[in-house]
Swiss-Prot record:
The gene is fwdC. Its EC number is 1.2.7.12. It catalyses: N-formylmethanofuran + 2 oxidized [2Fe-2S]-[ferredoxin] + H2O = methanofuran + 2 reduced [2Fe-2S]-[ferredoxin] + CO2 + H(+). Belongs to the FwdC/FmdC family. Sequence repeats lie at residues 77-89, 96-108, 115-127, 141-153, 160-172, 179-191, 198-210. The keyword Aminoacyl-tRNA synthetase does not apply. It comes from Methanococcus maripaludis (Methanococcus deltae). This is Tungsten-containing formylmethanofuran dehydrogenase 2 subunit C.
Amino acid sequence: MNELILNLKGDVSVPVEMDKIIPEKIQEMSLEKISGIELIQGNKTAKVSEIFDVELKESPVSKVTINNCCKKVKRIGEKMTSGEIVVNGDAGMYVGVEMKGGKITVNGDAESWVGQNLKGGEIIINGNAENYVGSAYRGDWRGMSGGKITITGTAGSELGEYLKGGTIVIKGNTKIMPGIHPNGGMIIIEGDIEGRAGGEMMKGAIVVYGKTLEPLPSFKFEGIVEDPLVKLFKKDAGTQLKGTFIKFSGDYVNTKPKGQLYAAIENNKNLI
């Protein structure tokens, strides 16, 4: 196994697309061949060696490390199926788009569309993420279907749009409309939200530990629950929550919805 180490040479003014640099694609390549890969940069292309200083060394796992990264470096880990990518610095849009396996860790902030249409694997952003975490392509009604995304900081609007499966965990606050149009999966928000969670929710679960505004009027109050076991489908082993929660079901703009919304009572006594 090899680890590819890419050290960004300097400031990047025109976005660079990194979809050709994923662990399974570069494993059998020589240093010379990797250095010569053409990356899309704006309306032109540039060789890897023109943008990065390139190193290759043996590793127990197939791995790509990008150092001094910035938000002009886009599409990191797109469609990867195995191995590991570590980004030291910020990352541009589309981290882990259509990823099926492996692990991506960003030690910095990330722009919008983290884990768009994620199918498997794990993405960890050790910082903040912008809008549409774990969401669908524009115009598509099939979003993230598997895997796990963890944001240790804050997240923007409309995370989990059209979520079908998998888990999204936000350690900080989120903006408006988390979990819009979901048909499965679980969203756990440990911070506060600006409201309108679960709009047009059909299936799935949203758990809010921080403060939230009053749920949409098309959600139904189900009662107070203690340490609930949240099941997303009949044969699901379930996710055990700890604490006391206010439970709502919805969204009743749909016919026979099975969506679940939990708000920690400690921070949301105004909802009772």
